Amino acid sequence: MENNGYKIHVAYGFHVNCYHSYRGDTNDAAGFGSDIRIIRGIIKTLDELNAAGIPVKGTWDSENFFSLEKILPAYAPDVLDGMRRRVKERGDENIIMGYSNGALGAMQEDELVSSVALAVTNPQGSGLKDLFGACEMIVRPQEVMFTPSQVKTYNKLGVKALCLYYSCVPFDAFKTLIPPLDDEKAYNPLTFEYRGEGLIVIPTYSNADVCDAGCLRAWVKELRKKQLDGTVKNDLFLFINMDADAIFWESLNLPVVKNRIANTDGIRGLVKEVADLEYVVFDTPGGYLRTHAPVGTIRFTQDTADGNFTGYASWAEKPYNRRIWTAIEKSRRAAKARENEEDFLNRLKLLSTTHFGLATPVLNIQREQTANELAEKLMDAAFLPEGPLTLYNASGTVLQCVQLRCKTAKALAVKGEGLEAYTVLPMGDDSVFLLLRFSEVKKEYVITAEETENAPCGDEAFFTLESAGTKLEFGADKRIRRFSINGQTVGGEEFLSSYLTYGGKRYDFSPDGMEIGWLTGGRYIKLFGGVGLPKAKRQGAYAFTFFTSDAVKGIFVLADVSYPYTPERDAISTENSSLGRYTDMRWQEAAPFCLSFENERPVSVIKRNFEGDISAFRVDSYAEADPKNRTLDSFNNQLTAGLIGLTDGRKGLLLGFSRSVLSSMACCPMRLTEGGRVKMNPFGTFDGRQRHHPNRSGDVVPRTYTLIAPQGKSLAPSYNGSRERALMCLTPFEGELPDEERMRELLAFADGAFATGTDTLLAPYNGENVWVQSAEKQTGKVRVRSPLFGGVKGNPVKYAFRGARALGYIVKKQRRAK
């Protein structure tokens, strides 16, 4: 084999974010102390390697507001000095993470633009150009959160490329979304295309991928062999990027073996393993892009994130997530009526992924307190009770939907200029939800209300709700029998299921009764009953109020679920995770309103992101990327800006939900079962087997990773003792999508109106629709167990066996690579 002149460029990326969901705000092991220690060590080691003649460079993607502006200047100015010096003297590179380590993929366009722009330069001087003099216009999104329509926004910003994981473990962005890439494409820039726009994507790898190859030297030699035999006809770029506080960057100093085993000597070992190979070039992403063009094109329409189940689960499926996200949505609605720079910046800060996850099943208490304070600021700013009761039109249509505080339990008559029809839905406390249709589109509507007689009612009993060809039929057994559109069945007797999985056993919600009645401007059928678990301190209850409206087509449902509360005795603090609280890890799944779609052909998921883009992806694409993913216990690659749904091309089901009542960035996980059937789990969470990722180690490393990764645990314990109230619209349709008018109405319901001012009976609602169980103060003798050995994800023998197999694999590959 001849030397063909091709090189392998290796880059090391350090993801600097000192603001964690699983640790607090102190300069010690319970806070950001380990970040500072490890980053100092990285800088020191890189300096030593350079002094020894090895021209290694670092690539830093750093969070600005919390880390560069607050924490590091106060507690570790030497770290900033070291980073600045290395940029100037050693060619280190800074790339963009985002101003407040925000959930970039779930941002509106204005939020994304500001997050990137402020990361480059800002008045506080914490921008990358402010601190380091320069930065590459390359974005490594926090948690690799990305939605395809943002290609256009990134292009407007002058962003050259995104770094997205193409990884062998669930800490990944797109490896399971597209057919496997050959090595020439997997280690080179690619062009991502979406609706006529293109943006470079750099496939990125983590320390888990290094272990999957055995060691970096084995990985590089394997790729070199393909260059020499002609399988690969190009230079290759291997970008290893991981959290800067990861222990893999520092020497583990293991007894006896003394760091002689690969992957135990931190950044020093990773560099020295390949420093003697003449075909290795130490580089940076920007450096490689300056001399290398994209070698291929990729396309996918899923939304990416690197959380549990390779998606958005970790930041979107906990009740607490929805509490914080709904405050963000209310702030967004308020901005339609009142622009305020301070509110906007507070919203950017609250959009930090750290206020939602990755911590599982709950956040660090201190982090939760900070998020609560920011959310309260946004809620207070959005509460404007002065003047007449006015609805600001956020949807640009004649349909206005809003939750309001109500001072009476009596029926209401609502008045307003041009008001043609309306429905009043009591929400079960001191609030109501109004659906109002006006005769023409205006920027704002003034309304008033007065008490009236109870809603008119008929004498007949009914077991069916109908609206514009949609029929929801109930049986005397207090269950749904059939859901259809113009005679086509969308769901049968299994259409709706409600259950918890606890301690390995399924517990279905217990129906107690069914209530039939009339609303002002509609009629309803309410199903209600109990939600029980064994030995619960407090049992739960549910009520699903299905109703129709004179103001708009569709069948709506108010879902109010109070979960049982079980004793919490499992500690969830570890060496790397200081959550400071207990939980009950026997909770495994929460499926309060699980919907089964009766498809006849392959299914596509319809979704809407927060830029307003509506797109779809085929669930078959998972199996096309990896046949082992023909079924998936859970997937959440679908952002939910008020809309989510399924279609088989002939018929479909859209679920709209009021974003200002209850929402999250991705509130509807799904399950793909045999035969291509999909279950939707709005405001719930699934558990089970993680998605399979193609890998080099015969699943040895990925299986070990999924066993020990704390974010891989179930999110269901976060539902313990909580209560949530959501308002949804069930919209079956024929064809691939509903007609434009129906879609416009559904989005108007989802986006809602923003209310200011006060009437004698009605006022803006500034309360909650999600209540989270307070952390229980432990007293007396408590049997505390680590969730690592709680039985939910295995036992110590399994951990030891898989760990030994992984270690043996690494040692074997290391020996062969000498």
What are these regions (language model features)?
Residues 2-137, 144-201, 217-234, 268, ...:
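Catalytic alpha-helical scaffold of carbohydrate-active enzymes acting on polysaccharides/glycoconjugates
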Residues 17-19, 64-67, 100-104, 144-147, ...:
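Short, solvent-exposed loop/turn segments at secondary-structure junctions
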Residues 22-31, 251-262:
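A solvent-exposed, charged loop/short amphipathic helix patch at secondary-structure junctions
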Residues 97, 139, 240, 284, ...:
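Conserved, mostly hydrophobic/aromatic
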Residues 153, 252-256, 295:
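Short glycine/threonine-rich loop-to-helix capping motif typified by GTGT followed
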Residues 234-257:
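A conserved active-site cap/scaffold subdomain adjacent to cofactor or substrate pockets
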Residues 258, 265-511, 518-520, 524, ...:
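Terminal accessory/anchoring regions of large secretory-pathway or extracellular enzymes
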